[in-house]
A protein has these predicted regions:
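A generic structural signal for short beta-strands and their flanking turns/coil linkers
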Residues: 82-84, 133-137, 173
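Short, well-ordered strand-loop elements centered on a beta-strand within folded domains, enriched
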Residues: 92-100, 111, 138, 148-152, ...
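Internal helical hairpin/lid segments
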Residues: 107-152, 157
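ATP/nucleoside-binding phosphotransfer catalytic cores, i.e., glycine-rich phosphate-binding loops
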Residues: 141-211
Length: 211
């Protein structure tokens, strides 16, 4: 894992985003998979990524999980923010991820690597320091015994699993790895099959989200 560069899109303690205009969303996504599909479709067509109204998912939870659904997006409480995404190459196939990526052979044995743009994966607060617009990805990797994995699952709910001497963690902008055996790649909750290698990098300020 290598850190590259030193800039940040948003600085800690700095106000993030702006009040959103009513009707400002071009498309809507209720979860990370739907948001990812919108981004991938426009990247594939080489067309501008539309402004997306987001009402659910792990990225939405990192934004504070505001209630109200689409009704909120039309209200004075709606906010507009820039979001980073992850460009991913698995073998010779290109993908986008918006919230997180997991590399593993099994949840219960073998190494697991998490690449996080959002701090959340479901109920798990995997990367408490992660921010979806700071220009960095948070990476955690480990190969824990089964007993420690059970304990870790409990601590992931509150984010108290770090620091842990059995888990390597860091912040990166780019990442590449050759796997010793074909390894599952799970992008935003979607299993994209087993692959021998991966390369990825952060794409800062890739899209605008209203929430």
């Amino acid at each position: 894992m290598e850190m590259i560069g030193a800039w940040m899109t948003i600085k800690r303690g700095q106000d993030w985003g702006l009040p959103a205009e009513a009707g400002g969303a071009d498309q809507f996504a209720a979860n990370d998979m739907e948001l990812r599909a919108i981004v991938e479709a426009n990247c594939s067509d080489q067309t501008p990524i539309p402004v997306v109204g987001l009402t659910g998912g792990d990225l939405w939870r990192a934004l504070g999980a505001p209630a109200g659904g689409r009704r909120r997006l039309q209200s004075k409480e709606a906010r507009e923010v820039s979001i980073d995404v992850i460009d991913v190459c698995l073998g010779d196939q290109n993908y986008i991820a918006v919230a997180h990526i997991f590399f593993l052979t099994s949840w219960w044995r073998g190494p697991v690597t998490a690449v996080m743009n959002s701090e959340w994966r479901g109920r798990w607060r995997v990367a408490p320091r992660a921010h979806p617009n700071d220009g960095w990805l948070d990476v955690l990797a480990g190969d824990l015994p089964i007993r420690q994995r059970f304990l870790l699952r409990e601590r992931l709910v509150t984010g108290d699993h770090l620091p842990n001497s059995a888990i390597r963690s860091g912040r990166i902008k780019e990442f590449s790895q050759e796997f010793s055996r074909p390894t599952r790649a799970i992008l935003d909750g979607v299993d994209e099959g087993r692959h021998d290698s991966v390369s990825l990098k952060i794409r800062p300020d890739a899209l605008t989200v209203i929430y």
